[in-house]
Amino acid sequence: MSEVVVKEQLEQYISKIERLEQEKADLSQEVKDIFQDASSHGFDVKAMKSILKLKKLDKDKLAEQDAMLELYRDTLGI
């Protein structure tokens, strides 16, 4: 490959990464704004984040986690 082609490819990769990093930052700000809006309407943001995390688990893992949590709560009388 010629140096010109390599330089152009590198510039394209860098440009794409920069664009995606900016999009990621923009999306992160949008998510933050949504949480702030939900909070201002009385929703518990911490609970919402927990729900989002739980939704990512498959049903078997979620059931296992729920069972373990219930066992620990019962053991500790909570």
Swiss-Prot record:
Question: According to its UniProt record, what is one Pfam family this protein matches?
Answer: GapR_DNA-bd
Query: One MF term in GO for this entry?
Result: DNA binding
Q: Which family does it belong to?
A: Belongs to the UPF0335 family.
Q: What is this protein called?
A: UPF0335 protein RMA_0160
Question: Which organism was this protein described from?
Answer: Rickettsia massiliae (strain Mtu5)
Q: What is the lineage of its organism?
A: Bacteria, Pseudomonadati, Pseudomonadota, Alphaproteobacteria, Rickettsiales
